[in-house]
Design a protein with these regions (language model features):
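Non-ligating segments of multi-cofactor redox enzymes
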Residues: 1-393, 399-400, 405-682
Length: 682
C-alpha cells in the first residue's frame, strides 16, 4: 500500500463529513481543472474556507439572512391612506328629518362641483357621520339621503353636532395599506427567527415569568438538531459568532499584544455565567438579555446600525436622541467584539452563556468527532480549531466541539471522521502525547465548587440588587412607563421582556424607544412609548408580531386598535384654551383623523351678562378626553408638543400627556380586548 494514500475508511452507522479533504501538493505540473481553480480561490479567501467551505457558506447565508431580517424586513415600514379626494367644507344643516335620515345643507357659495347622483361622506369636525346620496341641488342648498338607515348614534351626531360640516369624496381616516400589511408582505420568515432559536432566551424567560413561553418549542427544535450536530448553532447559525469572526479577521489578528494563554480561570466562565442567569431567573429577574448571543447583537445593531440607516436613508432629525442606557448597551456590544483581542472568538469559546446551553446539551450528542490511528501528530488540527475543542493528543473536547469540520480539511492523512459517538473502530490512542488533562481531581473539584458558588451568589446578588433598585411596583407614586399595546401586566412584562430591541426596530415612527434607568436596572432597555416623539399608528401592530417571548402579545389589528396603552390627561393649567390663552384644537383634529374620536370640545371661559346669559363671541372651545374611547396612542401629545412646544415655544411640555397606571391601561395575559370593551359598555 502506498504510504501517501489515505487509509481505507472504516464502516460506521452514519458519517457527517462535509469538509473539503486535504490535497497534497504535487511535484509534477498538474492540468488546470475547475476543481483546482475552486481550491485556489478558497485558499486565497482563507484556510478555514478551504478546509470547510460548507460551514462558511452556511455561516454567510445565516449572517446575511439576519441582516436582511433586521435592516429590510423590520424597516422601513409604510402605509398609504386613501387620497383625500374633493373636500367641500363650510356647510350648515338647514333641515334634518330623523325618520328618513334626509337632510338639507346650505353653503354661502352654493353647491359648486356637485351634482345629483353623487355620493359623499358627511363629516362633522373630522368624524364621519355616514355616506349620503345627493338627491337634488337648489341654488345654495344640497339635499341628501343616507345610503343606509341611520343608527341612533348617527342621529345623535346630526342633532348635537356643532359643525362646521364638510362633504368628503372619500371616507376620512381610511387606509387601504397598513403597516401590518407591509410587515406581512416582507416576512417570508419571521423577523424574530434568530431570537426564538436562541434557547437561553426562552428558557430564562419561562423560568423568570413562571409561565409557558411559546418560543420554547423553537428552542427545543434547535436543541434536538444539535444532538446530531453538537453546538451547530454556534458553529453555523449564530450571527454574533460570524460577526466576531469578521472582527477577528479584520482587526483581532493584527493586534496580538493582549493575547492570553490557552488555559486559565476564564475557560469555564460561560458555565458560571449561565448558572448566574438561571439563578437570577429563578429569583424573578431576567438578565439573559444582557448576555445571550442574539439579544446582544440585535440590540447592538439597533443602537449603532439603525440610527445610521435612518439618518442616511431618511433624515437625521428622525433619529431619536441617545441616553445613558444606549451607551451602556453599545459598550457591552463593543466589549464582546473586543474580547477577540485576547484570543480569536474569545466570547464564543469561554464567555457566551447561550453557547454554554449547547455545551451542556452536547452531553446528549449522538455524533462526535473521532480521530483514527493513522494520525501522524502533525498538530494542524489543533492550530486551526476555532473553538479550542481539540486536546494536545488530538482527541476531542466534546462539550466545545461545534462539528465545524475545519480540522478535517487540514488533516493530511484524513484521519478525522464525524460519526456516531459510540463508534470506536481503529481510533487513535488517548493521551498520546500526554495532554496534562486528567479527570476531576482535588484542584478541579475545588475550582468547580468555587466557580459554581460565584455563579449562584452572583445570580442571587444581581436579582436582589435589581429588585432593590428596580421598578418599585408596589409604590403608587413610582415611575410608570407607557408600554406597547398588548403588553402583559407590568410584573410579568419585566420578567418576560428580553430587551432585544426588535420591537423598536419595527416601530415605523420610533414611538417605542429604549427605557433608561427610570426604573433602575429592572426596566433598562425595555420598550416604552415616547409620545413627545411620535404617536402609535392605528394601522400598525408590528411590535407584538416580532416579540420573541410574548411580553407584547401578537394582536390582530382590530384588537390592537382598542387595547388601551394609557390615558390622555389634559393639564388644565397648561392647555391654551383651558388657560384662556388662545384657541387650539390640535389634539382634537389628530384624534379624529386617527379614527378614535376620543377628544371632544366643551365651551370654557364664556362670559355672561347681568341676566346670566352667555355673551356671544366670548370663551373658547377646549378639549376634554372621553376616557371610554381613549387608547393612549399618544398622537395628541405628539402634535401638541411639536406645534405648541417646539415650533411656537408656547409650552415647555405638551399640555396633554399619556399616563399609564391602574384604570388607565389594559394589561392582560390573555383574552380579547374587544370583548373587554364590550363588557365595559354594558
Amino acid at each position: 500500500m502506498d504510504p501517501h494514500e489515505p487509509p481505507q475508511r472504516k464502516r460506521s452507522l452514519f458519517r457527517l463529513d462535509h469538509f473539503l479533504p486535504f490535497q497534497r501538493a504535487s511535484s509534477k505540473p498538474q492540468a488546470k481543472t475547475a476543481a483546482s481553480s475552486v481550491r485556489k480561490l478558497l485558499r486565497r479567501i482563507g484556510p478555514t474556507m478551504l478546509s470547510s467551505p460548507v460551514r462558511r457558506v452556511v455561516q454567510t447565508i445565516c449572517f446575511l439572512s439576519f441582516l436582511w431580517l433586521f435592516f429590510y424586513v423590520c424597516w422601513p415600514y409604510h402605509a398609504r391612506p386613501h387620497a383625500a379626494g374633493m373636500i367641500q367644507a363650510g356647510w350648515r344643516v338647514a333641515e334634518f328629518d330623523q325618520n328618513s335620515g334626509g337632510l338639507s345643507l346650505e353653503h354661502d357659495n352654493g353647491a359648486e362641483n356637485l351634482r345629483a347622483g353623487q355620493k359623499r361622506f358627511l363629516v362633522d369636525q373630522g368624524a364621519a357621520v355616514g355616506r349620503f346620496n345627493i338627491t337634488g341641488i337648489e341654488d345654495k342648498r344640497v339635499h341628501l339621503m343616507p345610503d343606509a338607515p341611520l343608527s341612533a348614534k348617527q342621529i345623535d351626531q346630526m342633532l348635537f353636532g356643532v359643525g362646521p360640516w364638510a362633504l368628503h369624496e372619500t371616507e376620512p381616516g381610511q387606509w387601504p395599506s397598513h403597516y401590518t400589511d407591509d410587515l406581512a408582505r416582507k416576512e417570508i420568515v419571521p423577523a424574530e427567527t434568530f431570537l426564538i432559536i436562541d434557547p437561553l432566551v426562552s428558557l430564562s424567560t419561562a423560568i423568570a415569568a413562571r409561565s409557558w413561553v411559546w418560543s420554547l418549542v423553537c428552542a427545543g427544535v434547535i436543541l434536538i438538531v444539535c444532538v446530531f450536530i453538537p453546538r451547530g448553532f454556534c458553529g453555523y447559525l449564530c450571527p454574533l459568532g460570524t460577526l466576531i469572526d469578521l472582527f477577528d479577521w479584520a482587526i483581532g489578528k493584527r493586534v496580538t499584544r493582549f493575547r492570553v494563554a490557552k488555559d486559565g480561570w476564564w475557560v469555564h466562565i460561560k458555565y458560571y455565567l449561565l448558572l448566574a442567569v438561571l439563578v437570577a431567573a429563578f429569583g424573578g429577574v431576567l438578565i439573559s438579555g444582557y448576555v445571550a448571543a442574539i439579544p446582544v447583537i440585535t440590540r447592538g445593531l439597533l443602537f449603532i446600525g439603525e440610527p445610521l440607516q435612518s439618518g442616511i436613508a431618511r433624515e437625521w432629525h428622525l433619529v431619536p436622541p441617545m441616553h445613558a442606557g444606549h451607551v451602556v448597551s453599545i459598550l457591552l456590544f463593543l466589549g464582546v467584539l473586543a474580547l477577540g483581542l485576547l484570543k480569536p472568538r474569545f466570547w464564543c469559546k469561554y464567555v457566551c452563556p447561550s453557547g454554554a446551553v449547547f455545551s451542556v446539551a452536547n452531553l446528549f450528542r449522538v455524533s462526535e468527532r473521532k480521530v483514527e490511528s493513522s494520525c501522524i501528530n502533525c498538530n494542524k488540527c489543533v492550530a486551526i480549531c476555532p473553538f479550542d475543542a481539540i486536546k494536545p493528543d488530538f482527541t476531542t473536547r466534546v462539550t466545545d466541539c461545534t462539528l465545524c469540520q475545519t480540522c478535517g480539511g487540514v488533516c493530511p492523512t484524513q484521519s478525522i471522521k464525524f460519526v456516531e459517538r459510540w463508534n470506536v473502530m481503529d481510533l487513535k490512542a488517548v493521551n498520546d502525547p500526554p495532554t496534562g488533562e486528567t479527570a476531576l481531581g482535588r484542584r478541579g473539584f475545588m475550582s468547580l465548587i468555587t466557580g459554581s458558588g460565584i455563579g449562584v451568589a452572583g445570580g442571587g446578588a444581581i436579582a436582589a440588587t435589581t429588585k432593590l433598585w428596580g421598578a418599585n411596583l408596589n409604590d403608587p407614586h413610582a415611575f410608570r412607563p407607557v408600554r406597547p399595546p398588548g403588553s402583559v401586566p407590568e410584573p410579568a412584562f419585566l420578567d418576560m421582556c428580553i430587551r432585544c430591541g426588535e420591537c423598536f426596530k419595527v416601530c415605523p415612527n420610533n414611538v417605542l424607544q429604549a427605557e433608561g434607568f427610570e426604573q433602575g436596572l429592572e426596566g433598562l432597555w425595555a420598550p416604552m412609548v415616547k409620545a413627545d416623539w411620535a404617536g402609535c399608528e392605528s394601522s400598525c401592530n408590528a411590535c407584538g408580531q416580532v416579540c420573541p417571548t410574548g411580553a407584547i402579545r401578537p394582536l390582530p389589528l382590530a384588537e390592537k386598535r382598542v387595547a388601551r396603552m394609557g390615558l390622555a390627561i389634559v393639564d388644565l393649567q397648561a392647555c391654551l384654551p383651558h388657560a384662556n390663552r388662545e384657541a387650539c384644537q390640535l389634539c382634537v383634529d389628530e384624534c379624529h383623523a386617527a379614527g378614535y374620536h376620543a377628544i371632544e370640545f366643551v365651551q370654557v371661559h364664556t362670559e355672561v351678562d347681568a341676566a346670566g346669559q352667555p355673551i356671544e363671541g366670548t370663551g373658547h372651545l377646549a378639549p376634554v378626553v372621553l376616557t371610554d374611547k381613549c387608547v393612549g396612542c399618544g398622537i395628541c401629545q405628539t402634535r401638541c408638543f411639536g406645534i405648541n412646544g417646539l415650533e411656537k415655544n408656547l409650552l415647555k411640555q405638551s399640555a396633554i400627556i399619556i399616563k399609564a397606571g391602574e384604570g388607565r391601561e389594559d394589561r392582560i395575559m390573555s383574552g380579547s380586548y374587544l370583548k373587554l370593551r364590550e363588557a365595559e359598555a354594558r
